[in-house]
């Protein structure tokens, strides 16, 4: 029963979980949350603990390289949301709404098992432990854990286009992720989903095609160049012949 009680932020077990989470973050612990987009057991928003924000939390998405297409608009959009969260910015709740909209298996439903068997899942946690600053020395351990209240079965699918529009027109997001937004708009135009669930999602994401983006860099300093990275989603999804994180 406790497993289902986690679906409400005001349940006894959820409150106790957040209190324990705050204690380990204050002690300087780094946390890694990796979720599978093809998991028929654990929703992505739950696996990624998307309701919480803290600089010591790193998130990543596992994508089975065999089950999924080489390039999938939905996967890349989810990866962009994870990247935005990892950079410490607000994703306008798009990650949670997207994962709630596609809860359950999208292709094979094997992601829940394969996630635990993928060596790079553990490699990422090890790299995050040893290759980033200590939360104690950087001051991250003194930052409070910020949480968003939630309740079971309260997802409103009509919030999705508003959330998407808010993200794409956020001046901070447009400044740092303009290259990625341009890619997303092009990929959406070429997206041809086949299942009813994904076709419904495509219709709700229709505002993507109406967003206007500048063709020239903005006047803000230090805007990332299109030549900065070969893969704009590398921090959120590491490419691998077998799988992607």
Predicted regions and their residues:
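Lipid deacylating catalytic domains
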Residues: 1-245
């Amino acid at each position: 029963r406790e497993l289902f009680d986690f679906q409400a932020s005001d349940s006894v077990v959820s409150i106790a979980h957040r209190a324990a989470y705050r204690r380990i973050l204050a002690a300087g612990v780094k946390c890694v949350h990796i979720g599978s987009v093809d998991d028929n057991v654990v929703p992505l928003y739950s696996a990624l603990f998307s309701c919480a924000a803290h600089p010591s939390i790193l998130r990543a998405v596992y994508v089975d390289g065999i089950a999924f297409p080489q390039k999938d608009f939905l996967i890349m959009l989810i990866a962009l949301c994870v990247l935005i969260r990892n950079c410490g910015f607000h994703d306008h709740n798009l990650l949670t709404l997207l994962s709630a909209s596609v809860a359950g298996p999208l292709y094979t439903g094997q992601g829940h098992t394969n996630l635990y068997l993928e060596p790079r899942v553990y490699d990422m946690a090890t790299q995050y432990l040893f290759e980033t600053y200590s939360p104690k020395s950087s001051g991250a351990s003194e930052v409070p854990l910020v949480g968003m209240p939630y309740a079971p079965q309260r997802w409103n699918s009509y919030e999705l286009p508003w959330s998407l529009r808010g993200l794409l027109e956020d001046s901070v997001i447009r400044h740092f992720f303009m290259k990625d937004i341009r890619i997303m708009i092009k990929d959406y135009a070429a997206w041809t989903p086949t299942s009813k669930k994904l076709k419904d999602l495509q219709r709700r994401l229709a505002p993507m095609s109406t967003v206007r983006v500048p063709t020239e860099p903005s006047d803000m300093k230090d805007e990332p160049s299109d030549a900065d990275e070969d893969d704009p989603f590398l921090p959120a999804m590491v490419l691998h012949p077998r799988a992607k994180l």
